[in-house]
Amino acid sequence: MEKHAFIKTFDRLMGELNIKEIVTDAHVQIASLMHPEKGRYKDQGVVHSLDIWHAAKNLTKRLHAAGTTSGQSQILVCLKDVVNHFWFSCQKACNREEFMCIWRGVLHHVCGEHELFLGRCLHAPLDEETANKEVIPPGSAAHEALSQIVLNRRWLKDVEKFLTFRSTSELESFQNHILMYAGKRFSFSPPVYEARTLLAALDTTIITTEQCM
């Protein structure tokens, strides 16, 4: 259903707008449509970016699951640091090579290693509280589990799509606003639903304009 809706909407917009980039969550079928070599829209030159917030949320879930496993609770101590480092890596890097160089550094950071042979952590000097934070011993079960998550090939195969540092949060906020006019508990004919969606769009535009004034 999402694939059909995406195709219908995207085809319509392509005829009305000069689309340079589209941002979605990690939907397999949509990713297939936007594949630069095999996808339906491969010849359109549209950049496909993935929502950074959903990626960070997914990373948080996997870290939490690993941290609740026996012998790996130290992952929970550094969970926030690892997720923040992912945000930083995506914002700082311009390509896959730069991202991996920065991203892999977190495996040393959580061990308390901030000065390395080929470089150092990019953060400012740590305050006393942070410097005294519990670290993960290299080679421990927790560190091995963290390494498997950080270096997971399946998760990193689309890393370039995160480097544009995009988010769909405003769209999701608008979707919630639509529910005020067209709640899911009620049924509407297509013309009525379209009219209610347009009202939601007008309302959102007015609110946004007032906030900017």
Question: For the regions a protein language model found, what residue spans apply to each?
Answer:
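Acidic/histidine-rich catalytic cores and adjacent linkers
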Residues: 7-17, 21-39, 43, 53, ...
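Inter-helix linker motif
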Residues: 42-67
